[in-house]
Amino acid sequence: MQLLEERILTDGNILGENILKVDNFLTHQVDYRLMKAIGKVFAQKYAEAGITKVVTIEASGIAPAVYAAEAMDVPMIFAKKHKNITMTEGILTAEVYSFTKQVMSTVSIAGKFLSKEDKVLIIDDFLANGQAAKGLIEIIGQAGAQVVGVGIVIEKSFQDGRRLIEDMGIEVTSLARIKNFENGNLNFLEADA
């Protein structure tokens, strides 16, 4: 997605050898116009897939996921990273390792929001090692629902996340694919949409 790649080049900051900071438009402050455009691209890509739910993980996946859900006219569910006293029955959980925060979290979704009839599109802000998506796939599987695809805003293609998900037989659609970071710059691969 050219608009997204341009925004990454303009407002993204490279930290160290493999971290891209995009807090100016995605991970802290949100550019809703860009998120709306991202949502439309995912909706167009999966228009014929019969998606019934969009699922993400809190927090930075929420903005692109809600706009994708709006464009598809389906509900959006976000997995919670912290225990909630109001979530007491029928909780679906998975352990997820965060590459950025370098911590293990138990993420959860109330089972009443997913059923075996659901066809789910997972949306997330980043794909690095694939652990967040893998955890969501596990939770969705516990409900008996089908994961139709994983939509990613920014993929770090030099890490193993895509291969992990595709080896599970699930399609990955990334709107910006980073080939590498080199001398303080980043290089893109061709995006999926």
From Swiss-Prot:
What are the alphabetically sorted keywords of the record? Cytoplasm, Glycosyltransferase, Purine salvage, Transferase
- Pathway membership, UniProt: Purine metabolism; XMP biosynthesis via salvage pathway; XMP from xanthine: step 1/1
Q: Which SUPFAM superfamilies match?
A: PRTase-like
Show the GO MF annotations: xanthine phosphoribosyltransferase activity
* Compartments reported by the entry: Cytoplasm
GO cellular component terms, alphabetically, are: cytoplasm
Oligomeric state and partners?
A: Homodimer.
Q: What is this protein called?
A: Xanthine phosphoribosyltransferase
User: What's the encoding gene here?
Assistant: xpt
